[in-house]
Amino acid sequence: MKTTSFILALVLSTSLGKAQNAPQVSYFPLQNVKLLDSPFLQAQQTDLHYILALDPDRLLAPFLREAGLQPKAPSYTNWENTGLDGHIGGHYLSALSMMYAATGDTAVYNRLNYMLNELNRAQQTVGTGFIGGTPGSLQLWKDIKAGKIRAGGFDLNGKWVPLYNIHKTYAGLRDAYLYAGSDLARQMLIAFTDWMIDITSGLSDEQMQDMLRSEHGGLNETFADVAEITGDKKYLELARRFSHKLILDPLIKEEDKLTGMHANTQIPKVIGYKRIAEVSQDDKTWNHAAEWDHAARFFWNTVVNHRSVCIGGNSVREHFHPSDNFTSMLNDVQGPETCNTYNMLRLTKMLYQNSHNPNQTNEPDPNYVNYYERALYNHILASQEPDKGGFVYFTPMRPGHYRVYSQPETSMWCCVGSGLENHTKYGEFIYAYRKDTLYVNLFIPSQLT
């Protein structure tokens, strides 16, 4: 029997499909890994309490309002009623789905089904497949379909990043299907994606690229996921159309043009480039998979090895500073953003799966794992207040400074949304395998079944 080898590695859910080349490793479903007593289990349990403390009817209010239905409770405040209405609701679907997979908690499962049923009611009422909470959504998308596009970094036609906002709903529906097995979520996801095809089918490639100047999350990734879920190539074409060439083209050429850019606008785009490369592996009519995969790896290497600090985080005031000057990182009170590391870990998982150790051809590259471990332990785990479960937006590197944690009723930042997800899925990365070789990826007390 072959000796079991133990290396630091990381995992990715097998449900998200095959890599560009045959994956070096496979991954265990989240429900097969039970956390044992450790700070990670404590973080998971604390997050569970935080998740269930949120009022689903308040999170659903923006979606019902935009569908012309009467909300059952008022919206939350902060970012949830100032233009980004509904973004937490999408993250909430993902968090519930992964928490259910990790714990089997029936209260979580019931909460997820309630959210999905109410969102389905909103979707059916609108009648086009659309689901969203951005104020004035229906007119906004009518204008976009007509080619009336006014895009800036954080707005689209005067609205606060509506593409970014609906990406959270797309991702939440995907996760409800993949992690919790909801057929309803699958149906809603496909209908929602068909709606986007209808909205954008009349837009030229130039209009699409103009629209993508507005932050849009990882829509290209989720559309590639829909392509794999359904086996329908039209969704893969949509994913490619939602890939921002302003970022992609320099990366293909191995050019670092990131200085001054909003960091977490770019990272999800790159996740999408990698995902499209994976799903396109069997597409004989499209021969860019290798270069898109390479672009994602160049981006990762640039950010991890030239733009990150010891905790694995990056950015100052949400933007990439010059790679040869970290002065602002040491002086500013707004250091690395938690959302950035959330997305860098997602990218790292994907790249690791079909990587190659330069010193051992048949083994995956441990450099991806070294970063993953560093960022998970020092940034993600530390971003949660361990008793009450609040989440951190910025982790300052400024000596002697402090961090500010969210409050469940009043804080609805982006890093609250990603924070809800971060602590649900620790078990997904602990183990991996290939044939008769088991990789113990993270030294977290746990039981594999």
Give the location of each predicted region.
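Bacterial Sec-dependent N-terminal signal peptides
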Residues: 1-21
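Glycan-recognition and catalytic cores of secretory/periplasmic carbohydrate-active enzymes
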Residues: 20-449
